[in-house]
Amino acid sequence: MGKDLVRYYFEIHSGLVTCYYDTNGVSIRHEERTEFEIYPGYHVPEWLKGAVMYQIYVDRFCNGDPSNDVETGEYFYIGDTSVKVDNWEKVPAVMGVREFYGGDLQGVMDKLDYLQELGVDVIYLNPVFVSPSNHKYDCQDYDHIDPHIGRIVEDCDGLLSPGDSDNSHALKYIRRVTDKRNLEASNKLFQELVEEIHRRGMKVILDGVFNHCGSFNKWMDRERIYENQEGYEKGLMFRRTALSFFLLLPGSEPLAL
């Protein structure tokens, strides 16, 4: 197929109606950015062929370190405060993204014998970077593992008062996710976990989610979590209103700090 990137989409005609099929599914308009792509020279790694893969949603897997659990009222997220769930048999809420069961990377480490006994070859980790949700697809800091699933070595009091939705008052959350000691300790734990997985002959796939983030992200800092913390630049929210920078299209202004 040559050395060039191949882009394609399907154009479907039925009478006077024309529609298109691309990465967004079926639509009535064509956009170049949603075309399918084939990368030349791509080959499936040999170790992946026939491998047994085990996907881990970290918060719901195993609580190996209760000291890093998200607390009820630690911060405000999508209309309400965070909730710590003690009963693992509880049915998740409809809006369960702010409910935390306490699973963490230490819990994954503790269960490696179990995973190996199952015959697992590859561990696929759902997102693990700093994020206010339990699924962590709305990344807050791509440089660091979330201390709530990593290690918290520096902590403080400071839960939100009842009725308070201002996360600049969420002192406990701010300390946990901005203190470099917590972030570095969490990165170190992740490194130790990956090294141990590799030592056992298994592989790791990380769901990086590098194509989108959330408004908690330090680049924007809508929640004013980073604005007064040492070592962080002012987020974009500090410099202009939220208009169009959540979706970056060709020709839009760069999201540079």
Question: What are these regions, as identified by a protein language model?
Answer:
Residues 1-55, 63-80, 87:
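The feature marks proteins involved in alpha-glucan
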Residues 58-121, 128-257:
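Substrate-binding/active-site clefts of carbohydrate-active enzymes
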